Every structure is written in C-alpha cells, then in structure tokens.
UniProtKB/Swiss-Prot annotation:
Gene3D superfamilies: 1.10.287.3510. Belongs to the complex I subunit 4L family. Keywords: Cell membrane, Membrane, NAD, Quinone, Translocase, Transmembrane, Transmembrane helix, Transport. This is NADH-quinone oxidoreductase subunit K.
C-alpha cells in the first residue's frame, strides 16, 4: 500500500469516529468514537514515519496509545460512577456535573 492509501484509510476512520461522537448520545459509544479517532491519527503518524524512514511516527503513536490508555481508565471510571448514580449513560440525561 502507498502513503495515500494509508492516509485515506486514516481519514475514513477519523471521519467515522467523529460522526459517531457527533451523532450518538450514549457515552460509551461516544467514547469508542474518540478511541477510533485516536487510532486513525496513530495510523497517519506511522504512515508518515515510514515515508520519512524514521521512528518518529511510531514513537508518537506509542505515546498517543499511552495517553489513550490513561484516558480509558479515567473515562470508564467516570462512566461507571455516573451509571451507578443515574442508571443511565445517555449524555442527554446527564446534569450530574453541572454547578
């Protein structure tokens, strides 16, 4: 595959993730959309790194994965605590964090 193919795939994955975040109201599904966008950016970083023949893209993608893992831990903990309090993870019904 060429660089253009990887970038088109990355753009497609990012678009699907962004559409998921914008359209869905379930916090878990929105969370998966954000993770899809992060993985799409990782694919672009690695593709550009391979184009230039350096490990910079892989290193950046690794750090993005580390930050994404921390995001998953914190995000799922927040979603679970909201579910325990409200018995729903719908974003429309949440006013728990207001005020």
């Amino acid at each position: 595959m060429t660089l253009v193919n990887y970038l088109v795939l990355s753009g497609l994955l990012f678009t699907i993730g962004a559409a998921t975040v914008l359209v869905r109201r379930n916090a878990i599904i929105m969370f998966m959309g954000v993770e899809l966008m992060l993985n799409a950016s990782n694919l672009a970083f690695v593709a550009f790194g391979r184009l230039h023949g350096t490990l910079t893209g892989e290193v950046v993608a690794f750090f993005v994965m580390v930050v994404a893992a921390a995001e998953v831990v914190v995000g799922l903990a927040i979603i679970v605590s909201i579910y325990r309090a409200r018995r729903s993870v719908s974003v429309d019904e949440l006013s728990l964090l207001k005020n």
